[in-house]
Amino acid sequence: GDLSHHLETFPPVYQPTIKGERQQINSGTPWESLAGYSRALKIGNRILLSGTTATHGDLVVGRNDPVAQTHFVIDKIEASLESLGAKLSDVVRTRVFVRDAKGWEGALLAHGERFAEIKPANTTFFANLIGNEYLVEIEAEAQI
């Protein structure tokens, strides 16, 4: 899902912060500092990725389109993984949060397209996501 035509600029590759055994990356969203969390955290061979939405700077990518949002979210997850020396194929679990019944099928079809060969464990939830424009949020775990 290349949505680059929606964006004027791309963020630079995330640079990990190393604190002992922990490597963390932050994407620069205001929520990370406000709520005190990392976009992704690597400890040993395990990588945990926080809930990720279709946010680019102050722009919501794929507004009103759960398929586009899902592809963009997975692109962000993939960039986070690559920043920590992993790849999308290292994902072993995802959790997909969808706003409502109208968007679940499109979100899961996009998830299925991107993870067709990987087939991680997955749980899907209906959730009252923060911000009405967000239709999909995804958490992921990887093992390298």
What are these model-derived regions, one by one?
Residues 1-75, 79-92, 98-144:
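N-terminal presequence-like segments and the immediate start of the first folded domain
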